[in-house]
């Protein structure tokens, strides 16, 4: 069964007031559970990314790992995992940032990106743009160049492109 692009929204569950009151959480676990929907989403993202010249996908935990790993495999690229503090075993660089519902920090191994390496940032959801901007800063601290940012879901009502106005942004599903 092939799932049309617009139908992917049927596999995303809205959870009101999570993780706090006033937030609508877009839960992708039904999409992940459905093999046709998950494969279709990956294939659609691959089609959007395959013409871009890059070496590595940088993806934050946890849901970014799921899609980032699948995309890196399908595209024959490397994957750099970005984690919360204290989760990586080697020397790290860090970046603090604001979330839709608070503050956070991300870390990446200091040697994960080479000087001049072309990178695509991938995350499951683009909300305010804060996480994506923090990821870009980490890549640039390491000497890399972000050539594109890709997302499964973009929450356009939060206007994330304002913060990321200079970025090449690719989104599969918008709300």
From Swiss-Prot:
Reaction equation(s) it catalyzes: AMP + diphosphate = 5-phospho-alpha-D-ribose 1-diphosphate + adenine
Subcellular location: Cytoplasm
GO cellular component terms, semicolon-separated: cytoplasm
Keywords (A to Z) from UniProt: Cytoplasm, Glycosyltransferase, Purine salvage, Transferase
Assigned EC number: 2.4.2.7
GO molecular function: adenine binding; adenine phosphoribosyltransferase activity; AMP binding
One GO term (biological process): AMP salvage
Main location: cytoplasm
InterPro entries given in the database record: Ade_phspho_trans, PRibTrfase_dom, PRTase-like, UPRTase/APRTase
Annotated pathway: Purine metabolism; AMP biosynthesis via salvage pathway; AMP from adenine: step 1/1
HAMAP family registered for this protein in UniProt: Aden_phosphoribosyltr
Task of the protein: Catalyzes a salvage reaction resulting in the formation of AMP, that is energically less costly than de novo synthesis.
Subunit architecture: Homodimer.
Family indicated by similarity: Belongs to the purine/pyrimidine phosphoribosyltransferase family.
Listed PANTHER family: ADENINE PHOSPHORIBOSYLTRANSFERASE
Protein name as catalogued: Adenine phosphoribosyltransferase
Naturally occurring in which organism (per UniProt): Thermosipho melanesiensis (strain DSM 12029 / CIP 104789 / BI429)
